[in-house]
Every structure is written in structure tokens, then in C-alpha cells.
Amino acid sequence: MIQLKTLVNCIDNSGAAIVECVNVLRSKRPAKVGDRIVVVVQKQRNFGPESGPGGAVSISAANKVRRGDIRHAVVVRTAKKYQRPDGSVVKFDDNACVLINKAGEPIGTRLNGIVAAELREKKWSKILSLAPMHL
């Protein structure tokens, strides 16, 4: 469950590594898998050889977002246990999201890691098609 001030991993290649939830859209309850949230980019992901330990850390041209940007995101994994209709219980190791634009399309072109199958019920099939595996 994701609520205000929760730090969430960003698993796409948009350039964000860690984001902070500032609002759960269309709900007064905490966000679950498939819910849309508003986030602020807290930490950027470094790409390329120039961002190594010996070199100067630079903002790569591959980054589509910067630190401090306010974006929409979809929750794809939560650390809180939840029960599926068939009785199985699912729990992930971390909280993760995918950044999207205002139209609901993912900003990144590749996802790292698995996503929950509940995204299919919430009509996020574009995110499911980018993911390497869904559980």
C-alpha cells in the first residue's frame, strides 16, 4: 500500500530511480497495484560510462525526467500482502512503479523486473506488454 511520502522504486528506463508519492488519484485510501499516483522524482538513475565511480556524475541525455519533476505513475508492485480471488496471497519485496504521461502511456520503453498480473484487470495492458514477466 502506497500513501503520502512513501518512497517507491521506479523500474522503467525513464531516468528516475526513486520517487516519492505525493498524492493518490481518485481515492482517499492507500494505493494498491494498478492505481495511479502522483510522484516527485527524488533520485535519478545514472546511465553510461561517464557516471562511473571515478568520473564526474552527469545528467545523461537518456534521462527523460530530472530530480524534482512531478509526474504520474502506476503502482506495479507492493510490499503489502494481498489476496487474489482464487485464494492465493501475493507479496513482493519492494514497492515499485512505472512513470506515465498524462495520456496514460509509459514514459520509458523498457521495464526491469516483474509486475503484478492485476494490471490486466485495471486496463494497463501496455505496461504488461513491456514487462519481461508478470506474476
What residues fall within each predicted segment?
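Ribosome-associated RNA-binding proteins
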Residues: 1-135
